[in-house]
Amino acid sequence: MFAIIAAAKRRNIRHVMLNTNGIRIATEPDFAARLAEYMPRFEVYLQFDALSRAALQTIRGADLRRTHAMALANLENVGLSTTLVATVRKGVNDGEIGDILRHAAQWRCVRGVNFQPVQDTGRNEGFVAEQNRIVSSEIRRAILDQWGVFGEDDMIPLPCNPDAISIGYGLRDGTAIRPVTHLFPQEMLVREAPNSVTFESHPEMRARLIELLSLSCAGQRSAGVLHEILCCLPLVELPASLGYDKVFRVTIVSFLDRFNFCLAGVKRSCIHFVTPDGRIIPFDTYNLLHRQRPGPA
């Protein structure tokens, strides 16, 4: 694994993320410190589905509360940027969305939370589509109602795939989060077309805004772009130093499965697998059509 991270860091990759359940980070004393050596432009995507034992048992088959706590403590000790990633099942952990966000804000190393509606592909024991499927708009509503920090205009569609991805930004002050997405000029997100709003007066600001609302904008780069945008807006008080540690990002990313497959959605996909033979395959089709299945025992 370390060899793979090192190889990625040697290449022209803007930001490397390690997707992990956190077990080794929690249990091996020097593991987090070794990962921290790859900063900057490196981040941990930590599986974090719930705070309750019952929900974790249902989704992961184990009570991972202690593992999560130990992993976060070790990441906090080394100051390694971390995003919490929650798979959301209706009736299981959708009532904990606000609690997860509040918990995330307590850790200085956490840069935000990524919520993913459950996708019925691969290992998904006990999933009943009629009972457990949840859509992005329901998660967005839960963020607004349960957390109480973001308003209606603070979670907006991602331009590359507005049906599947929403994003919102806040500025961190200790454990307090101040929403800022509603301050972005909304007309700058409108696709340019005849008789539409023109952007000649602020072309650079629009370019920066679109760059910020991109899945490729992460780490210190997102902090820099956010600072450039907010400096252009009136009545925005910025911290003296706006680094990545002051940015708190909330995203909702939904993927397609056999029940909601949509070719137009695949064509707009922002997330891909790169295969050893050089092909680039959308995430939504990789698990359904391309992933190798284990043979009979």
Regions found by a protein language model. Name each.
Residues 1-117:
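Radical SAM/AdoMet-radical enzyme domain recognition
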Residues 18-19, 45-48, 85-88, 104, ...:
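Long, contiguous hydrophobic alpha-helical segments, chiefly transmembrane helices and signal peptides
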Residues 23-24, 93-94, 146-149, 249-253, ...:
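A short linear-motif detector with a strong N-terminal bias
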Residues 24, 129, 293-294:
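Sparse recognition of residues in long alpha-helices and their boundaries
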Residues 24, 52, 90-92, 175, ...:
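Residues that cap or initiate secondary-structure elements
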Residues 35-37, 160, 262-264:
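Sterically constrained small-residue positions within well-ordered secondary structures
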Residues 58-59, 65-66, 76-244:
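Radical SAM enzyme [4Fe-4S]-AdoMet core and its adjacent flexible, acidic
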Residues 198-297:
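Flexible mid-to-C-terminal extensions adjoining Fe-S/redox cofactors in radical SAM and related proteins
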